[in-house]
Amino acid sequence: MTALNWKPFIYGGLASITAECGTFPIDLTKTRLQVQGQANDAKYKEIRYRGMLHAIVRIWKEEGVKALYSGIAPAMLRQASYGTIKIGTYQSLKRLFVDCPEDETLVINVFCGVLSGVVSSCIANPTDVLKIRMQAQGSLIQGGMIGNFINIYQQEGTRGLWKGVSLTAQRAAIVVGVELPVYDITKKHLILSGLMGDTVYTHFLASFTCGLAGALASNPVDVVRTRMMNQRSIRNVSNSSYKGTLDCLLQTWKNEGFFALYKGFWPNWLRLGPWNIIFFITYEQLKKLNL
């Protein structure tokens, strides 16, 4: 067992913010695609976007380039908290079980990934709610991050800021429990087999693989989570479209079909792919710094 290392926390946060800035417009189109077509919500009933590219072009044309970065402030704040805690906790937990990366197993990595994903996502949930609300509003957004934070708290209370926290934790458990172990195992296999060295090309291939695995595993939960977070629940007023996460899942499947659970898959993957590539390459380079 080794002492707590602060570097994974700092490097994880910096790499997460870098990756978020580079892929944010794709994440915004994913949110817009996922909230549209809800039969029980008049505001989002219309199918405005045919796909990711159409969404980007239409948002740019109708709302301006700035709208593609609606919610970037809470997104960066989220990565500064979520990304920092996620990577730091994951790496620290692994060192509790084994001292050397070569001794890590898939079971250990999955367990550490799931636990770190749940802890970090629960802490960072308010920033996730803010990001999704601001992304969905686009050019109609009123006030900045602080103003929207206060508005949610005043109208919906503390529950509003932690809306969808169970789904966020479930999604994080799936994403982190899949992505980080897949990256580690892929990288380890490529290096130990002699196919590739510990180079940027290995980091690229491993991060591409883990991004695809994460998107396939998490998209249904992501759709339900997005819709639950975007749903307003005014205190003392019963006007919710969905009674809970299971109800949201069943209504989405019943009203829109099974593949509605994979709405936004392409932007989800096209975001997770580049996001993970940028993140892991940045993270691996930061690890080489002699600090």
UniProtKB/Swiss-Prot annotation:
Example of a GO cellular component annotation carried by this entry: mitochondrial inner membrane
Annotated compartments: Mitochondrion inner membrane
PROSITE patterns, per the entry: SOLCAR
Main location per the UniProt record: mitochondrion
Pfam families documented for this protein: Mito_carr
Start-end of each Solcar repeat: 7-96, 104-189, 198-289
PANTHER family: MITOCHONDRIAL DICARBOXYLATE CARRIER-RELATED
Name of the molecule in the record: Kidney mitochondrial carrier protein 1
